[in-house]
């Protein structure tokens, strides 16, 4: 799929320039690697040092073996940082392509909400409202009200 054949998400007015860069990066990645049933979501995230890390959803033949784009991006970020350095994710944007050939910002699944909030509870995570398909920023920890916290 080429980027030219998919309509980009309009940058929300409430989105910072830094987060808009994540949105663009995620859309460009997914336009390049999208494959129906295999790679349908891309994530771009920023760490406190300003670097952008990306990941793409990897669908396995056994559903349990599938890995979400958010986890892949977080693993890439972890691997790029020196040992002992906090992950320090500040923002996360994930996108998928709608059947109509349009990009859409999506919320992380429940497992990824747990993972993101475990490692970076104060990160901004962009989600889309259920009632209006409107992208909004939320604090990672707010994605899971009354989340139990593990002591690491």
Model region roles, listed by residue range:
Residues 56-71:
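Compact, glycine-rich, soluble single-domain proteins
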Residues 69-94:
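Short, solvent-exposed cationic patches
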Residues 15, 19-22, 45, 55, ...:
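Hydrophobic alpha-helical segments and helix-packing faces
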Residues 2-32, 36, 85-152:
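C-terminal binding/interaction regions
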């Amino acid at each position: 799929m080429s980027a030219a054949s998919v309509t980009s998400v309009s940058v929300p007015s409430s989105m910072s320039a830094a987060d808009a860069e994540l949105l663009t990066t995620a859309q460009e990645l997914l336009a390049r690697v999208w494959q129906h049933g295999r790679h349908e979501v891309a994530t771009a995230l920023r760490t406190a040092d300003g670097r952008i890390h990306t990941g793409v959803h990897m669908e396995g033949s056994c559903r349990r073996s599938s890995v979400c784009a958010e986890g892949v991006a977080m693993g890439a970020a972890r691997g790029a940082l020196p040992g002992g350095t906090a992950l320090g994710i500040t923002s996360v944007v994930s996108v998928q392509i709608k059947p109509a050939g349009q990009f859409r910002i999506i919320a992380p699944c429940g497992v990824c909400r747990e993972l993101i909030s475990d490692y970076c509870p104060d990160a901004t995570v962009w989600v889309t409202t259920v009632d209006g398909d409107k992208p909004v920023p939320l604090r990672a920890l707010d994605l899971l009200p009354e989340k139990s916290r593990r002591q690491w």
